[in-house]
Amino acid sequence: MSADQQRILLIVGSSRKEGNTRGVAEFLSDKTGAGLIDLSELSISYYDYEHKNQQDDFMDVARKMTEAAVIILATPVYWYSMSAQMKTFLDRWSDLLTIRKDLGRQLADKKLVLISCGSWEEPGEGFALPIRQTADYMEMQFAGYFHTWLADNEVFGNENVQKRVTLLQNSIEHIIGK
């Protein structure tokens, strides 16, 4: 992993491996050097109070998060909310407050950014609230929320989308001090 990739970790939670959210994430990864994790390629089980799911991939991702200075969560907007993959992933952060407090504490002061991608220009009010409150609870810095959209996975097929994604890239670079 390069120094930039260690600084930025981009985590994608989408049902479509070749979807619009993945397209935005790949564009940003290419432009910023961010490491990219696609939750659809991993096995991450639901949170359970008995912690029977410790053999899945969640803790590997959690360790990578502790190595990053900036964590970017990218999710499509499904039914006015984050994807099921992203919600399951966030629910598992509860493990970082119980059985792996050592990892959870290492997230303090890291920057957390949310990217959403949908088929309209703005998602509903309050879309970012769960991520903002998660950042607060984990003592992380919520560093921004950006929404964009794509048509047929073409970042530059639409002038408005191009402007939005370029603004997002510039904002991410500003957040990481590039």
Where do the model's predicted regions map?
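Short, charged/polar "capping" segments at the starts of alpha-helices
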Residues: 123-124, 153-156
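Short, glycine/serine-rich, charged loops/turns that create anion-binding
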Residues: 15-16, 119-120, 150
